[in-house]
Amino acid sequence: MTFNVEFHPKAAKEAKDMLRMNLELNYDFRQYLEELAEEPYKFPKKKGKLKSCRALYFKVKGNAWRLIFRIIDARDLVEIVAIGPHEDAYSSAVKRL
């Protein structure tokens, strides 16, 4: 089954800003989104306040970044909640849930 992928409005802005920062990431990012749509359950579950979420790890200019998302099975949906450097992504995700 393929899931639809949607962005929280603020996560969409974070994605645009990230891609502006690093244009070479465009192809990789599209691949990440396809992977989320095809196999969202393969990514690790989070704990604590983000226990309903999972995370995809990747690098931007050598720095660790996170794409935090949740799966809404009833709608066959993957909602991207936050994207950013490690700590920023997690704190933003907590505020948006």
Name each region found by the language model.
Residues 10, 51, 85:
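Residues that form or immediately flank small-molecule/cofactor binding pockets and catalytic motifs
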Residues 23, 27, 41, 79-81, ...:
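Short linear functional motifs in flexible/disordered or boundary regions
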Residues 34-61:
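A short, surface-exposed loop/turn module that caps and links secondary-structure elements
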Residues 1-32:
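Arg/Lys-rich, positively charged N-terminal/basic patches that mediate binding to nucleic acids
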Residues 4, 58-66, 70-97:
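Enriched for short, Lys/Arg-rich terminal
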